[in-house]
């Protein structure tokens, strides 16, 4: 699918299967989400540009690669997106963090915005927007709309699961934003949940209903 990368690493798929099980506990779900987010982050950042820097090792001077220019912003779509942040920040602790408050109205399935906080220089950084689920796509579309209003243009979207309907809507709204996901599931049900899915990621992560 154009503009969509499915990260099918065996460890990603193994951990995702355990997360899907309905009997997986809240604590295990949260731990697995942190672990899998590190693996996903590795893939979504694999083409970052490097520059050479002269350094001193204990033995000699050498030229060694280092990330070039201003670095990353991880933009979490609240609240479930926060479950992906910890593992990603373990990998890139210098990344800035943005929080975007968007929730889905369960009656209309439309996004409701309530919070936005991002670094002032988002136009100069690579923004990786994270949310475990790309269902209808409405929340992620709204979040990226807000980032673009602030000048962001180098954006990627990372999720755990995606529905074909959500991908179609997302790509129509933001064809310039590549999508990275661990799985493209079958479809959305009448309530807008991804099927077979794993349920509500936020509820399973925080033990709420």
UniProtKB/Swiss-Prot annotation:
Catalytic activity: UMP + diphosphate = 5-phospho-alpha-D-ribose 1-diphosphate + uracil
GO molecular function per UniProt: GTP binding; magnesium ion binding; uracil phosphoribosyltransferase activity
Pathway(s) per entry: Pyrimidine metabolism; UMP biosynthesis via salvage pathway; UMP from uracil: step 1/1
Catalytic class of the enzyme: transferase
Pfam family, one: UPRTase
Chain positions recorded as 5-phospho-alpha-D-ribose 1-diphosphate binding sites: 79, 104, 131-139, 200
Co-factor binding comment: Binds 1 Mg(2+) ion per subunit. The magnesium is bound as Mg-PRPP.
Activity control summary: Allosterically activated by GTP.
Keywords recorded for this protein, A-Z: Allosteric enzyme, Glycosyltransferase, GTP-binding, Magnesium, Nucleotide-binding, Transferase
EC id: 2.4.2.9
TM regions (residue ranges): none
Cofactor(s) listed in the protein's UniProt record: Mg(2+)
UniProt: uracil binding residues: 194, 199-201
Cell cycle listed as a keyword: no
UniProt record, GO biological process: UMP salvage; uracil salvage
Family matches, as PANTHER family: ADENINE PHOSPHORIBOSYLTRANSFERASE, URACIL PHOSPHORIBOSYLTRANSFERASE, CHLOROPLASTIC
Family per record: Belongs to the UPRTase family.
Role: Catalyzes the conversion of uracil and 5-phospho-alpha-D-ribose 1-diphosphate (PRPP) to UMP and diphosphate.
NCBIfam families associated with the record: PRK00129.1, upp
Protein name as annotated: Uracil phosphoribosyltransferase
Protein source organism: Rhizobium leguminosarum bv. trifolii (strain WSM2304)
Lineage, highest ranks first: Bacteria, Pseudomonadati, Pseudomonadota, Alphaproteobacteria, Hyphomicrobiales
Originating gene: upp
